[in-house]
């Protein structure tokens, strides 16, 4: 049927238009309502008129349809602006001709014009559809479209124009037209379907639908109303439509028969074909009179259908024999409507074109546009709110992940050398001799350095040899015989000394820079070699990642998901931008102009639908975020392990890179510094060589003069014979030795000689040392050569030490130099050169006799004046400040000429002189203490100790004159031939003097000279005086009483000696040691002053230092513990040692003035950080000697009064001086306490109850304490619930801010050091941690963190682990000096250096690694041993009031348990019994919340304390239950915190302990080392016990190996003594001690000028020069010994 001829189509005629005069009406309306010039719209009106003319004379083609649509649209635009409807203001008559009747119809309504145009549009489309022959597919499509457009136009006209303006536009006619057009469109579609051979069933349904449309049209045509309207046309249309109905019905049944044939339903096939044939016959009947095209189509159909029917009937009759069903029984064919009226949009801009009247916009349109804009904004806000919420979640999630897609998988970067490093390699590749030149330059510098040092050493040797020869000459001929010598030669020699000292000072400063330069070169030369080498080696030196394939897969997966996240972000941003742009460009004002107000809302909804697609995309993007983040979380979990590896690799990579780049950048600087050093030393070498030649010539001249004098004296008559006694040979003094071994105090005799050299100061002090001058003239020469620093210009050059050492300073007053000699029996006048201060007269004192010269060393601040004759003047710069900034004014005095008197032994009394105030000079470095020897030496800043007689006090002291008696606090002469003067502490100035109603001159005005006390004949000052009774002559307001033994130690770093700037000959301070009492001596108190111990001489009483009270008595405080001090009795005196018992006096009062040594008072207590805190080591109880009147019993010491202003001064640690459990009743009491203590926490209920009470108490206490400051620094707190209280937090004084999460925990036990409980440093707070350690002068750090926590990076490693690789934290550099691992802990010795200062502090870092974060240590024993180690290290430090820093991860859990057990153990060891642990816990928590965080920790501490008490009982012979009592073996490890004195180089001890022990090998027995026990520590009365309760002789627990099971007898034999090795004979005699002394970072020096001077041997200890050696003969029958204690040196 596809070739069937096409049926004809029905089409409609066009209506004809009449007049439409709209121009005048529009102009009037514009003028009236818009207020605009109507003439301005003439052009628009012309355009509209032209468009109408084209529309009413439209062409019969597709372009005509566009013209009609455009004109229809412009009419709508005009109507929206100018109301021209029926009855409206601008209505104009419109005329059109009616089609069927040909009449003209007029209406005053613009809608009539629109309706006529719509009708013509539909008619034109029907014409165009019917005109096509439909022979091609394209023609069929075009015709179908035209008929649908025509149906659409008629349908729009029917729906939107309900009023029938004319008959041809009535509703019935319009419905007929719609059905006709749809039927013809469906017919075209049928023809196309048959041409395409669609399925038979589909074609049948399409054909049936054609039948349905035509049936609807036929019913309309049969309507009488319609028939009357149509007239003649109605009959023609009806015949054609009826014929088509039957024809297309036949076509439908034909195709249904084809479908039955396909389904092999042959009976149905026959029925359908029969029906089709019947309907076709009906169509033929109705086709009579139709055109030939219709007849051809019917014939073609008959041939097809007839043939099909005949064939089917035959097949069924002869083959299939199926029954032919009736047509009614078969399934009816339902039509399939595939066409529809195409809608007409009159205002479609694509059709209407631009609005001609766009300039005319009514206000209603603007209002509607605003409403639409609000709808758009609402839509945008809604979407943006969703996007922002999702973006915020995404940003927070990604920030928490800290994942950067660019760095997640950047493994490629590690395979290449970075560009900045490549540049350095390239720069070095063109200079191949870089390393060679640097090494050669440093070698040349080292050679010149060595030459200069050798020359300076030669000069020093010459000067020392000359001085030694001069001394020998004086010893041989006597002072009178020696004579002053040629003054010119001495002046030249003094000039040489000054020049040598100046060059030596410069050389030593430069040697520091030289060593630093060598260190820097050694640090960088390896890196420079690497950078100069092949690139492969450089690449190999950089760390590389070692990842498994699984790790790489994890990285790729994470990278892929991160890319998805980024893609999601980008898509979201893009969609958001599209939405914004679309909304911004969306303007429907033109549409609103043409839209009715009633349809506004509908229009808005339709317009907003254009955003639906973007909204869907955005919502899908937002919904996908949850899935992406879930996948990213899983990938990040897998990435954690890989991330840690890559993070560590990145740190190592950057560190290595920075190190290599820094080495390259340091090369030029090293070369420059090296060249400067060579230039400097070349200049210095020439000057030193000149000085050497000069010194040689002067010394040769001096030697010749001495030889002449000796020859002349030998010719004289020899002196009469004197009693002789054996004396050791006078060996040559060691080089650089400032004093003789016999002249030094016992503390220093066991040290290497370099430790006793006065001017050998560490480099950091060179810049502050005052110049020293020896004035030519007859002043006493030193018996030992010493080096001195000279003033004057330095050699040119800029090669010097660190900058801070060379800063210009004000004229800082310095203390007098220290020289240690026994006090002679005469005095020499030593005054002061007048300065700028007011002048004061100085009372002169006559010479007390003639003897060996008294050595005097001073520190002048300017070249001295040239004096002649016996007059001698020196300018002294006293130190005026300590670290506590105690400033004393400086004044100068006129030194009167000495008055010679007969050579009679006279007692000499110090006369304190009033000193006016002058400008205080701050001193930058601490002045711990100094010793000076002389007569009128001023006592400088607080705590200056002088040995001599007349001394001046500097500072604002009250003006008092002292009677002829030695005031308190001044040297006390010893009786006996070997007695020596004792240095006493400098009295502290008090604000108001107290009157002294004594027979003495009254205080004078400052301008009046002080009268000279007249000497009176009396006993010799150094003769045997068995009946001397000193009376306590005291100035309590000048010398406040202080309980000895508990003064705060000085603040310098433990393990090394900090010398006082400007003071020569300082001995290193020693720690407090204890001595066993010998068979005939009293226990020696701890001693650290630089004083010699006298040897036993003839029988004489020994004074006991007694202490006067404070101005007013106060209760005995923690710092006022009475300590018994007993001086050593004579070796062979049978009488008991008498003691002086002073009585307390609230205020100074009058007293007799006997010429006897009075008692001395201890210095006052100082605040923490005060340089004078060394009083603990130099307090009166440590001074061996003093008068001791007859009488027995212990001295009663008075409690000191703590000043109110000193209320919060730190308390020094109480030492456990002796074993408190020697008494059986103490042991029995401890055993009873242990039995009761065991059951306190026996069951869980008791533990729970105690813990609950502690928690409640903590909450109660915490409510009254503030942590406001800690809350301000939340980033510095590891846990937000663990913060220090404001009241006792540690305050940083020099950081960016003053906060650190650390609390001071004090008051747990008098025997437990103060603790600083802090958290483990965070990566950002490590600098604060080390700053706190530096400011608090901490020497011991306890770390209670397991290795697992550091490996997991829960706790940052804030300390260096490799030597030579220091860590820099802010301004502090921390370096590892040594490391030692034991079974219980790891001990590290660290050095702490502030910025670029050369001075370093050593501290001990004790790490207990076996305490897990959640759990307990393996055993209590390990922790107990660790606590003992901690306490032992703490006792090695100086002073004993600095805190111990203890930290775990949080600073409360393990830290609290450690502090609790530490305090409890110390209480038990002190004999105070077992403390109440809950009370200690509450005391800790009152100072830091959450201390002892777990209940398990409390139980553990209870068990550990039980175990410790059991150990204490076992040590004293009390066995555990079930074991027999064994003899007490004190050789077991003593758990008392006593200093270990039984080792020098032996034993398995940490190197830090050996270093600290060096300073303690100083006390030796007064009777020589005949008794082995004499080398043991002495006893001091234990705190807390009354003096009378101390037995006369008690054993002291010691850490030495030999056992001591019984108290020492009164006079035991040597073989009964415990075998204790003598300190001087341990190890190599000298080199070992020198090695130990140089082990501390402060003592160690690369300065080769110190080499070659350590020549001590065993003979130095056995045969000392001054007769004080171990084998020195002790003459007891020499009557001359009463006059000269150094007589044995002069015997031949």
Curated annotation (Swiss-Prot):
Residues 774-785, 1620-1638 have a biased composition (Low complexity). Residues 8-394 form the BRO1 domain. Its EC number is 3.1.3.48. GO terms for biological process: cilium assembly; early endosome to late endosome transport; endocytic recycling; negative regulation of epithelial cell migration; positive regulation of adherens junction organization; positive regulation of early endosome to late endosome transport; positive regulation of homophilic cell adhesion; positive regulation of Wnt protein secretion. It catalyses: O-phospho-L-tyrosyl-[protein] + H2O = L-tyrosyl-[protein] + phosphate. The keyword Calcium does not apply. The active site is at residue 1448. Plays a role in sorting of endocytic ubiquitinated cargos into multivesicular bodies (MVBs) via its interaction with the ESCRT-I complex (endosomal sorting complex required for transport I), and possibly also other ESCRT complexes. May act as a negative regulator of Ras-mediated mitogenic activity. Plays a role in ciliogenesis. This is Tyrosine-protein phosphatase non-receptor type 23. It comes from Mus musculus. The gene is Ptpn23.
